[in-house]
Curated annotation (Swiss-Prot):
The keyword Cytoplasm applies. Coiled coil: none annotated. One of its GO terms (biological process) is coenzyme A biosynthetic process. GO terms for cellular component: cytoplasm. This is Phosphopantetheine adenylyltransferase. It comes from Paenarthrobacter aurescens (strain TC1). One of its GO terms (molecular function) is ATP binding. Homohexamer. SUPFAM superfamilies: Nucleotidylyl transferase. NCBIfam families: coaD_prev_kdtB, cyt_tran_rel. The gene is coaD. Gene3D superfamilies: HUPs.
Amino acid sequence: MRRAVCPGSFDPIHNGHLEVIARAAGLFDEVIVAVSTNYAKKYRFSLEDRMEMARETLASLRGIIVEPMGEGLLAEYCRHRGVSAIVKGLRSSSDFDYELPMATMNRQLTGVETVFLPAEAHYVHLSSTLIKEVNVLGGDISEYVPKSVLKRLLAGEPPTEPSRKG
């Protein structure tokens, strides 16, 4: 079985993410959407909410598993889950410059390869941060996020602090 992981914080998941994950699902038998938490970041949505939004929006795709990544190195997570490839979307050359050293390190640590998928032109400008900023300022983001995500963003819930379980 060819298994890949699409890691990210997905705060929130948007149509650019969905497009890359759908393309990955066409390349691999199983794609794990690994929702990460960086304890140095302030999140708009809790880990549970981010996972729920991902599950809701990806439910129609076969072979998709949504789970928390947990703490630690992505390469070790891949080894533990039997993943042969990490799939990353690239919006620009600066994304490539950022991702290439990590891809090289992941391959050296555990042999896991990184597959880069260029973003569709319609989504190259998207980021979760930009979507949250435009939303807070009253802009229309409905073209860029799934309806279930839009509903949550418009509900105006306060940002959440990541919780350490332990």
